Regions:
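Face-selective signature of the C-terminal outer-membrane beta-barrel domain
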Residues: 274-292, 308-423
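Outer-membrane beta-barrel domain signature
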Residues: 6, 109-110, 166, 210-212, ...
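Periplasmic N-terminal accessory/gating domains of Gram-negative outer-membrane beta-barrel systems
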Residues: 53, 82-186, 197, 203-204
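Structural signature of outer-membrane beta-barrel domains
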Residues: 88, 146, 158, 203, ...
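Predominantly transmembrane beta-strands of Gram-negative outer membrane beta-barrel pores used
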Residues: 150, 178-189, 195-203, 210-276, ...
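Residues that define the transmembrane beta-barrel architecture of outer-membrane proteins
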Residues: 115-117, 192-194, 217-221, 265-267, ...
């Protein structure tokens, strides 16, 4: 079955389902799905999640049962107090001892840099994670370089996770549902990097009612709109963010200055749709687009430079419950990152382009043969298009362009299988 938030329809990641008479339980996965095999009989079921009312139901098991549970937030008149604990042996016996799950709501309560809640700045507070210096792009995990971290947004690789030369991350906290960082002992489903995995998932959107959220910071503002497509079946979320550094710079550079028109700003946009086709099938479509724009003008010498760069990702995902013990997820993934340098003086124009584009597909299965085993297996394929350097230049009527001749094409494939066994 699945576990949902009763007010928003969001799937609940990590909801705990426990049968006291059998002292057995299960935790919902990243799609809110759970599966457990039990002997025939009648049992009490307890479903709990921090900040939500615990659900207790009497369940009769005389055949395969599929249920959907909706959890209501717990109302309280006083300030929230959350007490959490972990089994003292979890750090040494758990197969996920290198995984840290970050609470997005907790991140929003931390001091924000220039009014912006930042995922990358938050994870740098964790042990084993650091930044080389203030303003540096990326993060370092246990001595590994920034290029040794696999950063995923809804399964799509993000090659440059920073704005403003490292001061901000590309992740808008208003559009994020969960953040996991794996610093060691990476599961078999992830590959291609040595140091860590940063897995970020976007909100699915509220399938009960329209909601609008926004914020104004010192350097940027943001706006998020979410709501149902069809109530209880589908929802959407769109979120945008933009700096107004260009407006501030314009106020400090007068029109008569030789450097009038010099500017910098960044913007990004997140969107996600999901729809429940049947009780066993659900589709998701999510995307991200972000861009930094820097330009420098020297009007006296008729000289100008501009440097745009940014990421774009897209993920189309299909979830299917094949049977009570087997869950499938199929994804089609698009990723693009590019950097461009453009310069001109009088009639001469010069442009340099560099980038990487990926087209990929992935299939994942999760099999629950019994309550002590969780078997995951699947495969993926990625078609890479690398553009190390593409140059174009124009002087009056003379044009030079390398075009696609500098492109490098690559194919990457992988299969995996893993079994998480609870002794």
């Amino acid at each position: 079955g699945h576990v949902y938030d009763a007010e928003t329809g969001e799937t609940m990641i990590g909801a705990k389902l426990f049968f006291p008479e059998l002292t057995k339980g299960v935790v919902s996965n990243t799609f809110g799905f759970f599966s457990i095999s039990l002997p025939e009989g009648t049992y009490d079921l307890q479903i709990s999640y921090t900040g939500y009312e615990t659900i207790t139901e009497r369940i009769v098991l005389n055949q395969n049962v599929k249920r959907e549970f909706k959890m209501k937030p717990r109302a309280t008149e006083m300030g929230e107090v959350v007490i959490s604990a972990q089994n003292e042996r979890a750090n040494t016996e758990s197969t996920k001892m290198g995984t840290i799950e970050l609470d997005v709501e907790m991140m929003k309560t931390l001091p924000a840099f220039l009014g912006e809640v930042d995922v990358l700045k938050t994870i740098q507070l964790l042990p084993g994670v650091s930044s080389a210096n203030e303003g540096a792009q990326g993060f370092y995990v246990r001595g590994g370089g920034p290029d040794q971290n696999l950063v995923l947004l809804d399964g799509a690789t993000v090659y440059n996770a920073s704005h403003l030369f490292g001061f901000f991350s590309v992740f808008n906290a208003d559009a994020i549902k969960s953040v996991n960082i794996i610093k060691g002992g990476m599961p078999a489903e992830f590959g291609g990097r040595l140091a860590s995995v940063l897995e970020v998932k976007m909100n699915d959107g509220n399938n009960q009612r329209i909601g609008i959220d926004g914020g104004i910071g010192l350097l940027s503002s943001r706006l998020t709109v979410q709501g149902p497509i069809v109530k209880d079946k589908g929802s959407f979320i769109v979120s945008g963010r933009r700096t107004y550094l260009d407006l501030l710079l314009k106020a400090f550079i007068p029109e008569e200055s030789n450097f009038y028109g010099t500017t910098y700003f960044f913007h990004d946009f997140n969107a996600k749709l999901n729809y429940k086709i049947t009780d066993k099938d659900r589709i998701f479509l999510s995307g991200y687009f972000g861009r930094d724009e820097f330009s420098f003008n020297n009007n006296r010498d008729a000289f100008n430079v501009s440097m745009p760069w940014g990421n774009a990702t897209g993920t189309l995902r299909w979830n299917r419950i094949i049977n009570e013990k087997l869950f499938m997820n199929v994804s089609a993934i698009f990723t693009d990152y590019n950097f461009q340098f453009k310069s001109g003086i009088n009639d001469f124009q010069f442009s340099l382009f560099s980038g990487i584009r990926d087209y990929g597909s992935k299939i994942d299965f999760t099999w629950y043969p019994n309550p002590r085993h969780e078997v995951k297996f699947g495969g993926e394929y990625t078609y890479h298009i690398f553009t190390p350097t593409s140059v174009s230049a124009q002087d009056a009527d003379v044009v030079f362009n390398t075009g696609d001749i500098s492109n490098i094409y690559g194919h990457e494939g992988a299969f995996y299988i893993q079994d998480e066994f609870d002794g």
